[in-house]
Structure formats: C-alpha cells, structure tokens
C-alpha cells in the first residue's frame, strides 16, 4: 500500500536525520523499498527530490563530507548500489535498471605496494531523463549528459555527450540517439 510505504519512509528518513545524518534533506512522496540499506555518514549531505522510488534491495553509503543529490522522479530497480565518498549528482526523471552500481571512489593501489584500504574519491554526474539499463557500472569521473541511454552491462568512466546511446558488444560504442 503506497500510503504505508510513504509513511514508513518519512519516519525512517526523519530518524536518520535526527540521529545520524543532519545533512539529509528529502522531498515529498518518497517511495523507497523496506529493503533499502542506508549507511549515511553524519558529515555527508544527502538530498532526495520528490517522488524518488526504489523497488527491492538497494544500498546507499556515504562518506564524511560527501554530497549525494538525487533529483525528483528518479527510479531505482532492484539491487542498485550507490557508494558516495566524493560527489554524485543524478538529474530528475532518470531511471536505473536492476543491478546498477555507482561508485565515485576507488581503492588506492600501486605496483610496489599493491592495494590499500584507503580510497580516492571523485565525482559522478548523470543528467536528466536518462535510462541506465541493467547491470551498468558508473565509475568516478563519469559525466553523462541529459537524455542518454546506457545499455545493459556497460562500464562507464568519462564523458558521455547529451543525447547519446551507449552500448556494449565486445567493444563499447558511443553514438547519437536516432529519433524514431
């Protein structure tokens, strides 16, 4: 029932704001699934626009002084993961397929010392009215313009111009979206 879901989310998010992340702001009619896992650092700033929705399991983790901005009308399908240690901005009316993973951070590593538990953070921007299909991975340094489609299974890092369709079949290709 939608009303119960909205009430549950308002109570849960208000609780997080009072006792954890004072930088949490959220709009009206938040429809997040009960299986949402929120790990918000007290020093982070998190903004959820109106009618942000998730179906099924989802995980959101923020680090100290990180910024996560999710616009109004954004939808996340089952299994989405957001790890924000730097800055992630998602434009309004963007849709995410199942299993999408968004990481604005990466472990430090070197040939001499191997992998460290320390992380480096960057930025990710996803424009308005995009469709990010199933099992896409967005890495730090990603900048996706408005009205883009990112095909299933793509790993994205770097700039994707507005109005682009990105697909993967052996090699990743980027081309303008054709009007049909």
Where are the regions a protein language model picked out?
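An amphipathic, basic-hydrophobic alpha-helix
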Residues: 10-23
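Conserved short histidine dyad/triad with adjacent acidic residue
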Residues: 31
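Flexible, glycine/small-residue-enriched loop-and-beta-strand segment within the central core
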Residues: 36-142, 169-180
């Amino acid at each position: 029932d939608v009303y119960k879901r909205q009430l549950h989310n308002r109570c849960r998010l208000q609780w997080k704001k009072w006792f954890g992340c004072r930088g949490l702001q959220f709009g009206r009619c938040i429809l997040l699934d009960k299986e949402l896992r929120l790990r918000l650092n007290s020093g982070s700033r998190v903004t959820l626009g109106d009618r942000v929705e998730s179906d099924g399991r989802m995980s959101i983790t923020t680090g100290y002084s990180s910024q996560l901005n999710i616009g109004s009308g954004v939808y996340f399908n089952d299994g989405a993961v957001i790890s924000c240690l730097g800055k992630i901005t998602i434009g309004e009316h963007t849709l995410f397929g199942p299993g999408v993973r968004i990481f604005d951070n990466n472990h430090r590593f070197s040939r001499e010392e191997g992998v460290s538990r320390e992380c480096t953070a960057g930025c990710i921007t996803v424009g308005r009215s995009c469709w990010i299909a199933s099992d896409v991975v967005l890495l730090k340094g990603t900048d996706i313009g408005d009205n883009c489609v990112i095909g299933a299974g793509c790993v994205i890092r770097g700039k994707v111009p507005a109005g682009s369709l990105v697909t993967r079949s052996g090699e990743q290709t980027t081309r303008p979206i054709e009007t049909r």
